[in-house]
Amino acid sequence: MRPILVIPARMAATRLPGKPLADIHGRPMIAHVLDRAREAGIGPLAVACAEEEIAEAARAAGAQAVVVADDVPSGTDRVQRAMKALDPDSEYDVVVNLQGDFPTIRPETLRAVLAPLEDPSVDIGTLVCPIADEVEARTDSFVKCACAFTGDAMVAPALYFSRLPIPWGEGPRWHHIGVYAYRRAALDRFVTLPASPLELREKLEQLRALEAGMKISAARVEHGPFGVDTLEDLERARALLAP
């Protein structure tokens, strides 16, 4: 496996505009996300961004940066388009897509996303962690993954994703963490697929891959990162990252 890690980032955000450059102890949030990615030691780091000011911040933090026109439908498309510029000869066969609003993600959590790709039949790896309580289970902003880990297994096929508390009945439920490891061929295929019926219904783009017959497997971790989407989240990140 030859992985590269790419962070999609854009200034436009409904609840927290400009969040890639939001100040956390004198440095932009994107720099802190790059710190966590560097600590994970997965491979080279790059930022796929929509604006030059994000690119400047990424380069100042020691990463490559590619400005991608803001006409792409998703962060995944932004990552794939950036890879054409970063690696036109496809020397890297795995692309890790890390959201730019995870400044507190643990390095070991990030490294775990590669584990599903040890199975050559898996196209896309992702992460899940235990759902904490019924409030989280019934909150539609927390995406759930239907997967069944046998025994002490740390990886399981991801059978479905939903905003509802699936699966029904007694047993563990899993919160999906939006970090992905794509085989390069799977990433290139994914962006050519039209939006699928279940994707549009659930508003979850990973369902496009499942509906197209691609195999997604999830690695389980104990603790998921929180995404910075509001000013309250930003204050929490500042507290956790206080020097």
Residue positions per predicted region:
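Short, high-confidence coil segments that cap the C-terminus of an alpha-helix
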Residues: 42, 90-92, 119-123, 214
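Short phosphate-binding loop-to-helix
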Residues: 52-112
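N-terminal glycine-rich phosphate-binding loop and ensuing alpha1 helix
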Residues: 2-49
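Conserved core of the sugar-phosphate nucleotidyltransferase
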Residues: 105-196
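Hydrophobic/aromatic residues located in beta-strands of well-ordered beta-sheets
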Residues: 5, 45-47, 95, 125, ...
